[in-house]
Amino acid sequence: MTTSSYFLLVALGLLLYVRQSFSTHEHTCQLDDPAHPQGKCGSDLVNYHEEKCEEEEARRGGTNDGGKKRRRASPLWKRRRFLSMLKARAKRTGYKGIACECCQHYCTDQEFINYCPPVTESSSSSSSAA
């Protein structure tokens, strides 16, 4: 394969990746948008998101206590970092993301799972190897 066609293939793949990552956010929210009656906000959002990600990891062959083996940040630290990210996003005039999608609007369980980090082979194999 020539260099130019390789470059074109990589550029096309990158373009498709960027397009897919932006298409997952269906809404744009404003600061004064009210919360959806069935939306999850604040610590409820954090807890539910963490629960769904752990369930998805377990379903794909990981374990719920895999964080200790991979030296993942503690749940309290993740929660603080997540809440600070939500506050930073709220300062913007229009924002997208899990707070907009699942607090101001209603998210299905599958939409919550879409915000989970991908389960890698190393996370599944390291938990089963111990």
UniProtKB/Swiss-Prot annotation:
Record-linked InterPro entries: Insulin-like_sf (IPR036438), Insulin-rel_pep (IPR016724), Insulin_CS (IPR022353)
Record keyword Signal present: yes
Signal peptide: 1-24
Domain of life of the source: Eukaryota
Keywords linked to the UniProt accession: Carbohydrate metabolism, Cleavage on pair of basic residues, Disulfide bond, Gamma-carboxyglutamic acid, Glucose metabolism, Hormone, Hydroxylation, Secreted, Signal, Toxin
Coiled coil stretches, renumbered: none
Location(s) in or outside the cell: Secreted
Expression across tissues: Expressed by the venom gland.
Annotated region described as Disordered, given as residue ranges: 54-74
Pro-piece positions: 59-92
Main location: secreted
Molecular-function annotations in GO: hormone activity; toxin activity
Disulfide cross-links: C29-C100, C41-C103, C53-C116, C102-C107
GO CC terms, sorted: extracellular region
4-carboxyglutamate PTM sites in chain numbering: E111
BP GO terms, sorted: glucose metabolic process
Residue numbers bearing the 4-hydroxyproline modification: P34
Quaternary structure and interacting proteins, as annotated: Heterodimer of A and B chains; disulfide-linked.
Family, as annotated: Belongs to the insulin family.
Additional observations: Venom insulins constitute about 1/25 of the total venom of C.geographus.
Function of the molecule: This venom insulin, from a fish-hunting cone snail, facilitates prey capture by rapidly inducing hypoglycemic shock. Intraperitoneal injection of this peptide into zebrafish lowers blood glucose with the same potency than human insulin. In vivo, when applied to water, this peptide reduces overall locomotor activity of zebrafish larvae, observed as a significant decrease in the percentage of time spent swimming and movement frequency.
Protein name as it appears in the record: Con-Ins G2
